Curated annotation (Swiss-Prot):
InterPro entries: NADH_UbQ_OxRdtase_su1/FPO, NADH_UbQ_OxRdtase_su1_CS. It comes from Sodalis glossinidius (strain morsitans). The keyword Cytoplasm does not apply. HAMAP family: NDH1_NuoH. It is found in: Cell inner membrane. One of its GO terms (molecular function) is quinone binding. Disulfide bonds: none annotated. Signal peptide: none annotated. GO terms for biological process: aerobic respiration. This is NADH-quinone oxidoreductase subunit H. Pfam families: NADHdh. One of its GO terms (cellular component) is plasma membrane. Its main location: membrane.
């Protein structure tokens, strides 16, 4: 078969990797919603979903079927085009980011030299999904939720980017694979501890997860910017939130905890174990912490996260200059 040139084989391998990663990430994100409900029940001394299938294992399938058969209703006062576009952006923005995450030394869909910048770009794109949803719904609660989400996300993306600059400076590259390889002897969480703390806080805020879920606070805004959504459009928002958790957890592992590196076990297994640990931490945070006021969330960012990131950058620069001489 003369058409099977090395270039065609590379393209086919990339497509296969992309499809596998897409299926794995979406499946993990979907089943994380089931795991969260079961674990929250355990933490709160009650039963979670346990009726559909063995131990509730088919609850996710029941939820998907329910969403598929619900009416895909668009309010007559909404802007139809933007209203439909918003959940698609919310679902795909952080999902595409997973393409640059190296799962193992040989398994990465897109090995960009600007991987860190690509992640920041896609995280910034997620803001538009919230803004479009809140504005196009033509609902005051949706708009208030979108305004909260935009201010919160844009603020915490500043700290998200600054927290990564120390890692980039220490590794000497924006490439995520090179950053993982630079942690062969010492994980970045040790010299970049302040950067990790800030990245973790900003990552939770970008995902709009508890305790940074003020944009969709049920008691104040009646579910915020996706109050008018139903059916599969709401399902895209719902699954997109958990896909974002999977992506942020994978990036924490890649940037601060050595990525695929570890003894004895295959690289993919190490990467999966570390990522699953941080996914469980998202659930534990939701179970353990209360929701603060919106002004307290913004104060945490500008009064604590910003000084921490600047201190981390100064310390990293001092260490690099000292080692250079």
């Amino acid at each position: 078969m003369s058409w099977l040139t090395p270039e065609v084989i590379d393209i086919l391998l990339t497509v296969v990797k992309a499809v596998v990663i897409l299926l794995v990430v979406v499946t993990c994100g979907a089943y994380m919603s089931f795991a969260e409900r079961r674990l929250l029940g355990l933490f709160q001394n009650r039963y979670g979903p346990n009726r559909v299938g063995w131990g509730g294992s088919l609850q996710l399938l029941a939820d998907v079927l329910k969403m598929m058969f619900k009416e895909d209703w668009i309010p007559p006062f909404a802007d139809r085009g933007i209203f439909t576009l918003a959940p698609v952006i919310a679902f795909t923005s952080l999902l595409i980011t997973f393409a640059i995450v190296p799962v193992s030394p040989t398994w990465v869909v897109a090995d960009f030299n600007i991987g860190v910048l690509f992640f920041l770009m896609m995280a910034g794109l997620a803001v538009y999904a919230v803004l479009f949803a809140g504005w196009s719904s033509n609902n005051k609660y949706s708009l208030l939720g979108a305004m909260r989400a935009s201010a919160q996300t844009l603020s915490y993306e500043v700290f998200l980017g600054l927290s990564l600059m120390g890692v980039v400076a220490q590794a000497g590259s924006f490439n995520l694979g090179a950053i993982v390889e630079s942690q062969a002897h010492l994980w970045n969480v040790v010299p970049q501890f302040f950067g990790f703390v800030t990245f973790a806080l900003a990552g939770v805020a970008v995902c709009h997860r508890h305790p940074f879920d003020q944009p969709e606070a049920e008691q104040e805004l009646a579910d915020g910017y996706h109050i008018e959504y139903s059916g599969m459009k709401f399902g895209l928002f719902f699954v997109g939130e958990y896909v974002g958790i999977v992506t942020i957890s994978a990036l924490m592992v890649t940037l601060f905890f050595g990525g695929w590196q570890g003894p004895w076990l295959p690289p993919f297994i190490w990467f999966s174990i570390k990522t699953a640990f941080f996914m469980m931490m998202f659930i534990l945070i939701r179970a353990a912490l209360p929701r603060p006021r919106y002004d307290q969330v913004m104060a945490l960012g500008w009064k604590i996260c910003l000084p921490l990131t600047l201190l981390n950058l100064l310390a990293t620069a001092a260490v690099i200059l000292y080692n250079a001489h």
